[in-house]
């Protein structure tokens, strides 16, 4: 019994919930840092507060995948989790902008991320459950379309609220503007309604039907079992975990000590403590398996060790693909403003700031010394560049804001004008980066339906490699751009890569997974999205500050290079379920 093909509108309905999910992500990405700063967070604290997203994804998605694989009730298999996640996420979107304290906003971010992950993970598995192999590329491309549309509109919601509906975008100190609040209310409603549309307009196959479809597929195409059968006993597999886990704990402890002893950037603790934490969980799984406890933790890590070959190959591709994305998201604003816009100061202006800084008395504010210490490090770096023969340097907004806000500093009018010019250039550049991000999301939505056509003419691997290469060219080309308008052209390549990353790897993966493990493996696959994010948050600041001498543009070039590497690695992936591949074999 072959899995039936679904009409276009049925695929539309089953993917429509992603519109709401991405509205939640778009509002979060565009406004949460603003909420944190409004409630008193120092800029240096924000990356740590943002670690909620990858950590919750790392924990929640495999658990939800495992639970949904083993759920069947009158609502179905995946849809109960759509409903629970939608309710929780919608409530979190309403509460977050009304948080009176920073700790409450940070807590709501964790709840929001967990809720979004509860909803999102089963949506990936849902496509694998419902669509035959020849339609999966279209199904995941449909999700890319809704992601692009929602990201484009959601990012502009506060602007729309202010400029179209006249809702104020200013508020008393420590309060969130009404434009942001109403954007979150609207986003919460869209999230809930879009997911409910999918719940009420779709039905799911029963576990028995899915098993029959899988058996028919294996018989028709001669496919062996999609995951390796355990070739060792529980005791042997537990022993392996009991070796690997403590090794990771020890490595994490050693690296943490090195970070502490050498005074490295504190962001590196995210990586070192994370290594130890993963080791602790693996050790726990081994301990429970040794005692014949076959709960979710044991099953998740057993399945991690028994990943299908295709999934292992795709994991490496995803790792380098998402490292590039996080490099772009973190550093595009700094790269564009410092490399393309005029944020330069000459040697005389640097000397004046150094002298003014040396005359400042220590302030009593709790964060003043820390802020001034970072400004002094920047000024020392500027002096080093000038002594090396440079006639001017690129100023950081940290330095500019410090001296413009510091009322007791006596500066010449010319230097103050330079600082104001740099501030204006930075804001114009940052606004333009926001526009360019909107362009790549919008283009991703438009091009999403082109990907299945390209895959039909070539194959899924070639199409994905082309898209990643286009994205790499787009990122690297920013180094050579002098006209900001050309950034929009570069972002077309990025949009193609983004649309492909959100669809083709999942289409390839779904064909390599057994139906009864679709959810848990989609959750485990998220590891290879989250881990590069944690790695990027941990080491990119160190790399940019030391190896790249503070020039953020090279972070984009590094991202482009990792996309090229990912494009090459795609061709090593065994796409066992590619429709063209199976047609040739037949």
Describe the residue ranges of each PLM region.
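Intracellular juxtamembrane helix-capping segments at the cytosolic ends
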Residues: 118-131, 500-514
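Helix-to-loop junctions at the C-terminal end of transmembrane segments
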Residues: 59-75, 446-459, 544
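Hydrophobic core of transmembrane alpha-helices in multi-pass small-molecule transporters
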Residues: 92-96, 100-119, 486-500
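C-terminal transmembrane helical hairpin of 12-TM major facilitator-type secondary transporters
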Residues: 443, 455, 461-503
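Intracellular loop-helix junctions on the cytosolic face of multi-pass helical membrane proteins
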Residues: 1-8, 100-105, 118-119, 133-326, ...
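Helix-loop boundary and gating motifs at the non-cytosolic
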Residues: 2-56, 256-261, 313-317, 321-345
